[in-house]
Amino acid sequence: MSTSDRVRAILHATIQAYRGAPAYRQRGDVFCQLDRIGARLAEPLRIALAGTLKAGKSTLVNALVGDDIAPTDATEATRIVTWFRHGPTPRVTANHRGGRRANVPITRRGGLSFDLRRINPAELIDLEVEWPAEELIDATIVDTPGTSSLACDASERTLRLLVPADGVPRVDAVVFLLRTLNAADVALLKQIGGLVGGSVGALGIIGVASRADEIGAGRIDAMLSANDVAKRFTRELNQMGICQAVVPVSGLLALTARTLRQTEFIALRKLAGAERTELNRALLSVDRFVRRDSPLPVDAGIRAQLLERFGMFGIRMSIAVLAAGVTDSTGLAAELLERSGLVALRNVIDQQFAQRSDMLKAHTALVSLRRFVQTHPVPATPYVIADIDPLLADTHAFEELRMLSLLPSRATTLNDDEIASLRRIIGGSGTSAAARLGLDPANSREAPRAALAAAQHWRRRAAHPLNDPFTTRACRAAVRSAEAMVAEFSARR
């Protein structure tokens, strides 16, 4: 029986217990809450994007979805928690504090905007945006107000979502955008990280060095500078045991790459073919690039539009890519997307979140159910908790995620090669057998033997007499991961 099936069984037994309790059998609200907990198992993974004001969250949402669906201007919509879900047709719904739901008019002025003139934002809980994007089929993305916003209410909305007072998790994972490693960000990350270690809240946290092209002042090598910054962030956050990775991303370049227009490609190709001295002079600064008296072969108005869409870094990168031999808009878009860092971020999200989505959702459901039966006690409450706690404590996929988070910040008796191998075997590079064993996916015949060898190796390493308790725990986690693969291969025979 899978973990999700076990959660459903516990939930079914819990519902029966409440139906048998005189105080609750007529409480429709109680059964609605239990139904919602169960429904989470069938829903897409919930991933929240968080960070300080102007960190680039909405732009990154747009880049991940591949469309301008999250308002990026300083409107009321950016001060409200917004849920982006898959739907057959575009629709925006406002959820009011009293339970009322209202449709919100959608406008298009360069990008999506929500008309909230007839709605008091202070009365809203959140907004729900349904959009027919393939990227939203398997993941619901939650855009949050800046945590250091001058509007206290906006910041509090985000805190209520990420660090709920009732301990019931609203999301399954968090992508946290960082421009600097300031005290406010570290404090919030520690709170979320504390929830991870305490077996409640989101089990997965990924950091993003956002607006990465601005770290290097828009220079052609800006992403290299951003990569160095991301490594420093990773090192410092790892030492605190807060998150496993920080990825540098230029959300603006990623969004532009995913929505590149043929007219923009033609204009960039003209610029790339301009006289080299004049072009280099124009690319020195924003003012030079948009000067009306510039001899560049592209109208100043179009250059201003390119600047808004690409930024100076994106324009410089596009011209360099075209000069290197790319000949069509598809090739340019692919190169820009790769260089934006979005591909690397999506790979990390896939490894840490998507490949473990069932386990993350099961964890959220278990924590929510445990909190619910404590808040609404019935005679069966101790028995429900007795069923839940072993799953939260012992389910191996949860332990893998915790170990991946804890390993960088804890001292062990393992050497660097052993730590790298252990991270890989517990799923740090992906959850497929090939990824865990470091094998070519095409060479599947070696996998059963490699899994058995890994189980034997880590069993011996777990029994080493000089191990400290944490090292032994880590090695035992590797043993269980390897043994699970051995069992899976045996079942296929």
Curated annotation (Swiss-Prot):
Q: What induces it?
A: Specifically induced by a broad range of inhibitors of cell wall biosynthesis, including antibiotics that inhibit the synthesis of peptidoglycan (ampicillin), arabinogalactam (ethambutol), mycolic acids (isoniazid, ethionamide) and fatty acids (5-chloropyrazinamide). Down-regulated by the nucleoid-associated protein Lsr2.
One GO cellular component term of this record is: cytosol
InterPro entries per record: Dynamin_N, P-loop_NTPase, TRAFAC_Dynamin-like_GTPase
Q: What is this protein called?
A: Isoniazid-induced protein IniC
**Organism expressing this protein natively:** Mycobacterium tuberculosis (strain ATCC 25618 / H37Rv)
